Design a protein with these regions (language model features):
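Short acidic, glycine/serine/threonine-rich loops at helix termini
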Residues: 18-19, 90-92, 117-124, 168, ...
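A structural-propensity feature for long, helix-poor, extended segments
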Residues: 45-54, 296-298, 305-308, 393-425
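Extended C-terminal subregions enriched in glycine
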Residues: 334-365, 371
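Cap/lid and interdomain-hinge subdomains that line or gate substrate/regulatory clefts
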Residues: 2-6, 27-31, 61, 70-75, ...
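Active-site histidine-anchored catalytic micro-motif
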Residues: 67, 80-125, 140, 361-364, ...
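N-terminal basic/disordered segments at the start of proteins
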Residues: 1-44
Length: 425
Protein backbone atom coordinates (compact mmCIF):
# COMPACT_ATOMS: atom_id res chain seq x y z
CA UNK A 1 0.00 0.00 0.00
CA UNK A 2 1.19 3.50 -0.79
CA UNK A 3 1.28 6.24 1.83
CA UNK A 4 0.13 8.54 -0.98
CA UNK A 5 -0.82 8.11 -4.62
CA UNK A 6 -0.61 10.84 -7.27
CA UNK A 7 -2.58 10.22 -10.47
CA UNK A 8 -1.54 12.52 -13.33
CA UNK A 9 -2.64 12.69 -16.96
CA UNK A 10 0.87 13.27 -18.32
CA UNK A 11 4.46 12.61 -17.32
CA UNK A 12 5.68 16.14 -16.63
CA UNK A 13 2.62 16.67 -14.45
CA UNK A 14 3.38 13.53 -12.46
CA UNK A 15 6.95 14.75 -12.04
CA UNK A 16 6.31 18.33 -10.92
CA UNK A 17 3.53 17.21 -8.56
CA UNK A 18 5.67 14.45 -7.10
CA UNK A 19 8.35 17.07 -6.54
CA UNK A 20 6.04 18.78 -4.06
CA UNK A 21 6.42 15.72 -1.84
CA UNK A 22 10.03 14.83 -2.67
CA UNK A 23 11.25 18.31 -1.72
CA UNK A 24 9.97 17.63 1.80
CA UNK A 25 11.93 14.41 2.17
CA UNK A 26 9.36 11.89 0.97
CA UNK A 27 10.46 9.01 -1.23
CA UNK A 28 8.72 9.49 -4.58
CA UNK A 29 8.69 7.13 -7.54
CA UNK A 30 7.07 8.12 -10.84
CA UNK A 31 5.75 5.25 -12.92
CA UNK A 32 5.06 5.46 -16.64
CA UNK A 33 3.34 2.14 -17.06
CA UNK A 34 1.49 2.47 -13.80
CA UNK A 35 -1.48 0.33 -14.75
CA UNK A 36 0.51 -2.58 -16.11
CA UNK A 37 1.83 -4.06 -12.88
CA UNK A 38 -0.09 -5.09 -9.79
CA UNK A 39 1.97 -4.34 -6.67
CA UNK A 40 2.71 -6.56 -3.70
CA UNK A 41 -0.27 -5.90 -1.37
CA UNK A 42 1.87 -6.54 1.72
CA UNK A 43 4.47 -3.88 0.86
CA UNK A 44 4.24 -0.28 2.07
CA UNK A 45 5.73 2.43 -0.09
CA UNK A 46 5.92 6.16 0.44
CA UNK A 47 4.63 8.16 -2.55
CA UNK A 48 3.87 6.78 -5.99
CA UNK A 49 3.00 9.07 -8.91
CA UNK A 50 1.36 7.36 -11.87
CA UNK A 51 1.20 8.83 -15.38
CA UNK A 52 -2.01 7.59 -17.01
CA UNK A 53 -1.09 9.29 -20.33
CA UNK A 54 -4.75 10.28 -20.71
CA UNK A 55 -4.75 14.02 -21.40
CA UNK A 56 -5.63 13.59 -25.06
CA UNK A 57 -7.75 10.45 -24.64
CA UNK A 58 -11.52 10.29 -25.02
CA UNK A 59 -13.23 11.21 -21.71
CA UNK A 60 -14.47 7.68 -21.04
CA UNK A 61 -11.04 6.20 -21.76
CA UNK A 62 -9.39 8.78 -19.48
CA UNK A 63 -11.86 8.04 -16.68
CA UNK A 64 -11.18 4.31 -16.95
CA UNK A 65 -7.42 4.90 -16.78
CA UNK A 66 -7.83 6.92 -13.57
CA UNK A 67 -10.16 4.33 -12.03
CA UNK A 68 -7.70 1.55 -12.83
CA UNK A 69 -4.77 3.46 -11.31
CA UNK A 70 -6.59 4.24 -8.05
CA UNK A 71 -7.84 0.67 -7.71
CA UNK A 72 -4.46 -0.86 -8.58
CA UNK A 73 -2.51 1.20 -6.05
CA UNK A 74 -4.47 1.55 -2.78
CA UNK A 75 -3.23 4.54 -0.80
CA UNK A 76 -3.88 6.31 2.48
CA UNK A 77 -4.06 9.61 0.57
CA UNK A 78 -5.00 10.17 -3.09
CA UNK A 79 -4.00 13.27 -5.03
CA UNK A 80 -5.55 13.76 -8.46
CA UNK A 81 -3.20 15.96 -10.43
CA UNK A 82 -4.82 18.25 -13.01
CA UNK A 83 -3.12 20.56 -15.47
CA UNK A 84 -2.50 24.05 -14.10
CA UNK A 85 -4.06 25.43 -17.29
CA UNK A 86 -7.02 23.01 -17.09
CA UNK A 87 -6.20 21.15 -20.29
CA UNK A 88 -7.32 17.56 -20.73
CA UNK A 89 -10.22 15.58 -19.32
CA UNK A 90 -10.43 17.45 -16.04
CA UNK A 91 -14.03 16.70 -15.05
CA UNK A 92 -14.23 13.08 -16.18
CA UNK A 93 -10.94 12.24 -14.46
CA UNK A 94 -11.88 14.01 -11.22
CA UNK A 95 -15.24 12.24 -11.15
CA UNK A 96 -13.52 8.90 -11.70
CA UNK A 97 -11.02 9.57 -8.91
CA UNK A 98 -13.80 10.57 -6.50
CA UNK A 99 -15.67 7.34 -7.16
CA UNK A 100 -12.62 5.07 -7.10
CA UNK A 101 -11.23 6.62 -3.90
CA UNK A 102 -14.63 6.62 -2.17
CA UNK A 103 -14.23 10.32 -1.40
CA UNK A 104 -16.90 12.39 0.34
CA UNK A 105 -15.42 15.67 -0.85
CA UNK A 106 -12.94 16.79 -3.52
CA UNK A 107 -10.94 19.93 -2.85
CA UNK A 108 -10.14 21.33 -6.32
CA UNK A 109 -7.32 23.91 -6.31
CA UNK A 110 -5.37 23.98 -9.61
CA UNK A 111 -3.59 27.27 -8.80
CA UNK A 112 0.22 27.22 -8.94
CA UNK A 113 1.24 30.77 -7.95
CA UNK A 114 4.97 30.05 -8.29
CA UNK A 115 4.40 29.54 -12.03
CA UNK A 116 1.86 32.36 -12.45
CA UNK A 117 -1.34 30.28 -12.22
CA UNK A 118 -3.96 31.78 -9.87
CA UNK A 119 -7.68 31.45 -9.16
CA UNK A 120 -9.83 34.33 -7.88
CA UNK A 121 -13.62 34.54 -7.77
CA UNK A 122 -13.59 31.12 -9.39
CA UNK A 123 -11.74 32.41 -12.44
CA UNK A 124 -8.41 30.92 -13.39
CA UNK A 125 -5.62 33.07 -14.84
CA UNK A 126 -2.05 32.75 -16.12
CA UNK A 127 0.16 35.65 -15.04
CA UNK A 128 -2.95 37.81 -14.70
CA UNK A 129 -4.45 36.92 -18.09
CA UNK A 130 -7.77 35.04 -18.02
CA UNK A 131 -7.08 31.42 -18.94
CA UNK A 132 -9.32 31.52 -22.02
CA UNK A 133 -7.20 34.38 -23.39
CA UNK A 134 -3.78 33.00 -22.40
CA UNK A 135 -3.13 30.87 -25.48
CA UNK A 136 -3.44 27.38 -23.99
CA UNK A 137 -6.38 26.27 -26.12
CA UNK A 138 -8.82 26.32 -23.20
CA UNK A 139 -12.08 28.15 -23.89
CA UNK A 140 -13.30 28.60 -20.31
CA UNK A 141 -11.64 30.59 -17.50
CA UNK A 142 -14.20 29.87 -14.76
CA UNK A 143 -13.24 26.78 -12.77
CA UNK A 144 -16.86 26.24 -11.76
CA UNK A 145 -17.89 26.17 -15.42
CA UNK A 146 -15.11 23.69 -16.22
CA UNK A 147 -16.51 21.38 -13.53
CA UNK A 148 -20.16 21.99 -14.46
CA UNK A 149 -20.49 18.66 -16.30
CA UNK A 150 -19.56 16.70 -13.18
CA UNK A 151 -21.98 14.08 -11.91
CA UNK A 152 -21.46 15.65 -8.48
CA UNK A 153 -22.50 18.94 -6.98
CA UNK A 154 -20.01 21.81 -7.45
CA UNK A 155 -19.46 24.49 -4.79
CA UNK A 156 -17.07 27.44 -4.49
CA UNK A 157 -14.63 28.36 -1.71
CA UNK A 158 -13.98 32.12 -2.07
CA UNK A 159 -10.67 33.87 -1.55
CA UNK A 160 -11.90 35.78 1.50
CA UNK A 161 -12.48 32.50 3.35
CA UNK A 162 -9.20 30.99 2.22
CA UNK A 163 -7.31 34.12 3.32
CA UNK A 164 -8.72 33.70 6.84
CA UNK A 165 -6.68 30.53 7.26
CA UNK A 166 -6.96 26.80 7.81
CA UNK A 167 -9.65 26.90 10.51
CA UNK A 168 -11.92 29.05 8.33
CA UNK A 169 -11.36 26.67 5.43
CA UNK A 170 -12.16 23.65 7.60
CA UNK A 171 -15.41 25.20 8.76
CA UNK A 172 -16.47 26.23 5.27
CA UNK A 173 -15.68 22.81 3.82
CA UNK A 174 -17.65 21.14 6.61
CA UNK A 175 -20.65 23.36 5.86
CA UNK A 176 -20.46 22.69 2.12
CA UNK A 177 -20.15 18.96 2.61
CA UNK A 178 -23.03 18.92 5.07
CA UNK A 179 -25.33 21.00 2.88
CA UNK A 180 -25.43 18.52 0.01
CA UNK A 181 -25.57 14.85 -0.68
CA UNK A 182 -21.99 13.76 -0.80
CA UNK A 183 -19.72 13.70 -2.75
CA UNK A 184 -19.23 17.39 -3.54
CA UNK A 185 -16.53 19.15 -5.56
CA UNK A 186 -15.26 22.42 -4.07
CA UNK A 187 -13.60 24.84 -6.50
CA UNK A 188 -11.08 26.81 -4.43
CA UNK A 189 -9.68 30.28 -4.95
CA UNK A 190 -5.93 30.74 -4.34
CA UNK A 191 -3.48 33.42 -5.42
CA UNK A 192 -0.54 32.69 -3.09
CA UNK A 193 1.25 29.70 -1.60
CA UNK A 194 -0.17 30.65 1.80
CA UNK A 195 -3.67 30.23 0.36
CA UNK A 196 -2.81 26.74 -0.88
CA UNK A 197 -1.37 25.88 2.53
CA UNK A 198 -4.59 26.98 4.22
CA UNK A 199 -6.67 24.87 1.82
CA UNK A 200 -4.54 21.78 2.42
CA UNK A 201 -4.48 22.16 6.19
CA UNK A 202 -8.18 22.95 6.44
CA UNK A 203 -9.09 19.91 4.37
CA UNK A 204 -6.76 17.69 6.38
CA UNK A 205 -8.40 18.91 9.58
CA UNK A 206 -11.80 17.99 8.19
CA UNK A 207 -10.43 14.55 7.41
CA UNK A 208 -9.35 14.20 11.03
CA UNK A 209 -5.64 14.81 10.47
CA UNK A 210 -3.57 16.91 12.88
CA UNK A 211 -2.23 20.09 11.31
CA UNK A 212 0.51 22.43 12.42
CA UNK A 213 -1.67 25.55 12.47
CA UNK A 214 -3.91 24.23 15.19
CA UNK A 215 -7.06 23.96 13.06
CA UNK A 216 -9.24 21.60 15.03
CA UNK A 217 -9.65 18.13 13.55
CA UNK A 218 -13.38 17.67 13.22
CA UNK A 219 -14.24 14.46 11.48
CA UNK A 220 -13.33 11.50 9.35
CA UNK A 221 -14.36 12.70 5.89
CA UNK A 222 -12.58 11.03 3.00
CA UNK A 223 -10.94 13.89 1.10
CA UNK A 224 -9.67 13.76 -2.47
CA UNK A 225 -7.08 16.44 -3.17
CA UNK A 226 -7.22 17.80 -6.72
CA UNK A 227 -4.60 20.26 -7.91
CA UNK A 228 -1.43 20.97 -9.84
CA UNK A 229 2.11 21.02 -8.51
CA UNK A 230 1.22 23.97 -6.27
CA UNK A 231 -1.22 22.34 -3.84
CA UNK A 232 0.98 19.23 -3.64
CA UNK A 233 3.64 21.26 -1.84
CA UNK A 234 1.35 21.57 1.17
CA UNK A 235 -0.54 18.27 1.36
CA UNK A 236 0.66 16.04 4.20
CA UNK A 237 1.59 12.42 3.50
CA UNK A 238 0.56 9.96 6.24
CA UNK A 239 3.18 7.62 7.66
CA UNK A 240 6.92 7.87 8.09
CA UNK A 241 9.09 9.06 5.19
CA UNK A 242 10.91 6.30 3.36
CA UNK A 243 13.39 8.05 1.05
CA UNK A 244 14.14 6.18 -2.16
CA UNK A 245 17.69 6.51 -3.41
CA UNK A 246 19.04 5.49 -6.80
CA UNK A 247 22.71 6.21 -7.42
CA UNK A 248 23.06 8.54 -10.44
CA UNK A 249 25.44 7.58 -13.21
CA UNK A 250 28.80 9.33 -13.32
CA UNK A 251 28.83 9.56 -17.12
CA UNK A 252 29.37 13.07 -18.56
CA UNK A 253 27.22 14.63 -21.25
CA UNK A 254 23.73 16.14 -21.37
CA UNK A 255 21.12 15.69 -24.08
CA UNK A 256 18.00 17.88 -24.19
CA UNK A 257 15.00 16.62 -26.15
CA UNK A 258 12.48 19.38 -26.81
CA UNK A 259 9.09 18.23 -28.06
CA UNK A 260 6.83 20.99 -26.79
CA UNK A 261 5.69 23.61 -29.30
CA UNK A 262 4.43 25.96 -26.60
CA UNK A 263 5.44 29.55 -27.35
CA UNK A 264 7.35 29.73 -24.07
CA UNK A 265 9.43 26.70 -24.98
CA UNK A 266 10.24 28.18 -28.41
CA UNK A 267 11.53 31.31 -26.65
CA UNK A 268 13.69 29.10 -24.40
CA UNK A 269 15.10 27.29 -27.43
CA UNK A 270 16.05 30.61 -29.01
CA UNK A 271 18.28 31.33 -26.00
CA UNK A 272 20.40 28.24 -26.72
CA UNK A 273 23.36 28.60 -29.08
CA UNK A 274 22.60 27.30 -32.58
CA UNK A 275 25.85 25.34 -32.34
CA UNK A 276 24.24 23.08 -29.74
CA UNK A 277 20.94 22.46 -31.56
CA UNK A 278 20.17 19.62 -33.96
CA UNK A 279 16.87 20.34 -35.69
CA UNK A 280 15.02 17.48 -37.36
CA UNK A 281 13.13 18.27 -40.56
CA UNK A 282 9.52 18.44 -39.30
CA UNK A 283 7.98 17.34 -42.59
CA UNK A 284 10.37 14.39 -42.87
CA UNK A 285 9.66 13.49 -39.24
CA UNK A 286 5.98 13.09 -40.04
CA UNK A 287 6.63 11.09 -43.23
CA UNK A 288 9.26 8.71 -41.80
CA UNK A 289 9.90 9.25 -38.09
CA UNK A 290 12.29 6.33 -37.56
CA UNK A 291 14.60 7.23 -40.46
CA UNK A 292 14.50 10.92 -39.55
CA UNK A 293 15.38 10.03 -35.98
CA UNK A 294 18.22 7.76 -37.09
CA UNK A 295 19.78 10.56 -39.12
CA UNK A 296 19.35 12.95 -36.23
CA UNK A 297 21.10 10.52 -33.89
CA UNK A 298 24.20 10.53 -36.10
CA UNK A 299 24.43 14.31 -35.82
CA UNK A 300 23.76 14.21 -32.08
CA UNK A 301 26.51 11.68 -31.45
CA UNK A 302 29.03 13.86 -33.26
CA UNK A 303 27.93 16.93 -31.33
CA UNK A 304 27.99 15.16 -27.96
CA UNK A 305 31.47 13.82 -28.66
CA UNK A 306 32.68 17.38 -29.36
CA UNK A 307 30.74 19.45 -26.85
CA UNK A 308 29.29 17.10 -24.17
CA UNK A 309 25.91 18.78 -24.60
CA UNK A 310 23.30 18.86 -27.34
CA UNK A 311 19.67 19.77 -27.97
CA UNK A 312 17.38 18.03 -30.44
CA UNK A 313 14.05 19.44 -31.60
CA UNK A 314 11.80 19.48 -34.65
CA UNK A 315 10.37 22.95 -34.16
CA UNK A 316 12.07 26.27 -33.50
CA UNK A 317 9.31 28.48 -34.90
CA UNK A 318 5.70 28.50 -36.10
CA UNK A 319 6.82 27.65 -39.64
CA UNK A 320 8.14 24.28 -38.49
CA UNK A 321 4.86 23.52 -36.73
CA UNK A 322 2.87 24.40 -39.83
CA UNK A 323 5.12 22.25 -42.03
CA UNK A 324 4.53 19.20 -39.84
CA UNK A 325 0.79 19.78 -39.73
CA UNK A 326 0.63 20.24 -43.51
CA UNK A 327 2.25 16.86 -44.18
CA UNK A 328 0.10 15.24 -41.51
CA UNK A 329 -3.03 16.55 -43.22
CA UNK A 330 -1.83 15.14 -46.55
CA UNK A 331 -0.99 11.70 -45.17
CA UNK A 332 -3.65 11.29 -42.50
CA UNK A 333 -0.97 11.01 -39.80
CA UNK A 334 -0.93 12.67 -36.39
CA UNK A 335 1.82 15.30 -36.44
CA UNK A 336 2.58 15.34 -32.72
CA UNK A 337 2.77 11.57 -32.43
CA UNK A 338 5.03 11.17 -35.49
CA UNK A 339 7.35 13.98 -34.47
CA UNK A 340 7.53 12.57 -30.94
CA UNK A 341 8.55 9.20 -32.37
CA UNK A 342 11.27 10.85 -34.46
CA UNK A 343 12.64 12.74 -31.47
CA UNK A 344 12.57 9.59 -29.32
CA UNK A 345 14.38 7.66 -32.05
CA UNK A 346 17.04 10.37 -32.30
CA UNK A 347 17.47 10.43 -28.53
CA UNK A 348 17.60 6.64 -28.32
CA UNK A 349 20.35 6.48 -30.94
CA UNK A 350 22.35 9.19 -29.20
CA UNK A 351 22.02 7.55 -25.80
CA UNK A 352 23.13 4.20 -27.21
CA UNK A 353 26.08 5.90 -28.93
CA UNK A 354 27.46 8.83 -26.95
CA UNK A 355 25.82 7.61 -23.72
CA UNK A 356 25.15 10.99 -22.05
CA UNK A 357 24.61 10.70 -18.31
CA UNK A 358 21.84 13.30 -18.16
CA UNK A 359 18.65 14.07 -20.09
CA UNK A 360 16.48 17.19 -20.24
CA UNK A 361 12.99 16.37 -21.53
CA UNK A 362 10.70 19.29 -22.43
CA UNK A 363 7.07 18.37 -23.03
CA UNK A 364 5.10 15.55 -21.41
CA UNK A 365 4.43 13.55 -24.58
CA UNK A 366 8.04 13.54 -25.77
CA UNK A 367 9.29 12.77 -22.25
CA UNK A 368 7.14 9.66 -22.17
CA UNK A 369 8.18 8.70 -25.72
CA UNK A 370 11.89 8.99 -24.90
CA UNK A 371 11.66 7.05 -21.64
CA UNK A 372 9.55 4.35 -23.28
CA UNK A 373 12.21 4.04 -26.00
CA UNK A 374 14.82 3.63 -23.25
CA UNK A 375 12.74 0.96 -21.46
CA UNK A 376 12.72 3.18 -18.37
CA UNK A 377 9.36 2.51 -16.68
CA UNK A 378 10.09 4.26 -13.39
CA UNK A 379 11.90 7.37 -12.14
CA UNK A 380 12.99 8.28 -8.61
CA UNK A 381 12.74 11.97 -7.76
CA UNK A 382 15.79 13.38 -5.99
CA UNK A 383 13.96 16.25 -4.28
CA UNK A 384 16.04 18.79 -6.18
CA UNK A 385 14.75 21.07 -8.92
CA UNK A 386 16.37 23.35 -11.50
CA UNK A 387 13.42 25.76 -11.17
CA UNK A 388 9.77 25.71 -10.12
CA UNK A 389 8.09 22.93 -12.07
CA UNK A 390 11.43 21.56 -13.35
CA UNK A 391 12.36 18.61 -11.08
CA UNK A 392 15.36 16.31 -11.20
CA UNK A 393 15.08 12.53 -11.10
CA UNK A 394 17.05 9.37 -11.78
CA UNK A 395 15.94 6.40 -13.89
CA UNK A 396 15.14 3.78 -11.24
CA UNK A 397 15.05 0.59 -13.31
CA UNK A 398 15.78 -0.84 -16.72
CA UNK A 399 18.84 -0.57 -19.00
CA UNK A 400 19.13 3.20 -18.46
CA UNK A 401 19.13 2.92 -14.64
CA UNK A 402 21.08 5.78 -13.06
CA UNK A 403 20.58 8.26 -15.92
CA UNK A 404 19.67 11.67 -14.54
CA UNK A 405 16.46 13.13 -15.98
CA UNK A 406 15.08 16.65 -15.73
CA UNK A 407 11.54 17.22 -17.03
CA UNK A 408 9.77 20.45 -17.93
CA UNK A 409 6.21 21.11 -19.04
CA UNK A 410 6.01 23.18 -22.20
CA UNK A 411 4.44 26.22 -20.56
CA UNK A 412 6.83 26.38 -17.58
CA UNK A 413 10.00 28.37 -17.08
CA UNK A 414 11.72 31.59 -18.06
CA UNK A 415 13.66 32.44 -21.20
CA UNK A 416 16.80 30.74 -19.84
CA UNK A 417 15.25 27.58 -18.37
CA UNK A 418 16.50 25.10 -20.99
CA UNK A 419 19.93 26.74 -20.94
CA UNK A 420 19.95 26.61 -17.13
CA UNK A 421 19.12 22.90 -17.25
CA UNK A 422 22.07 22.25 -19.55
CA UNK A 423 24.35 24.25 -17.26
CA UNK A 424 23.10 22.57 -14.08
CA UNK A 425 23.64 19.04 -15.36
Amino acid sequence: MENALVVADDLTGAMDTGQGFAARGRGVRVRLRGNAERPDPTATRDVLAVDTDSRDAAPAVAAEAVTRAVETYPAARVYKKVDSTLRGNVTSEVDAAVAAAGADLAVVAPAFPATGRTTEDGRHAVEGTPLAEAGYGVEESDLRAVLADSRYRVEHLPLATVADGAEAVRGALADLAGAADRPVLVACDATTDDHLRAIAEGAEALAGDPVSTGAEASGDSEILFVGSGGLARHVTVPGEPTPTTVQPASRPGTLAVVGSTNERTLVQLAAVSDELVVELDPAAAVRDPEETGRRGAVRLNRLLDRRDRAVVTAATDEGDIEAAEHVAAETGATAGERVGTALAAAAGGAIAGAQPGSLVLAGGAVARAVLTRLEAPELALTGRAIADGVPESVVASGPARGTRVVTKAGGFGTERTILNCLDAL
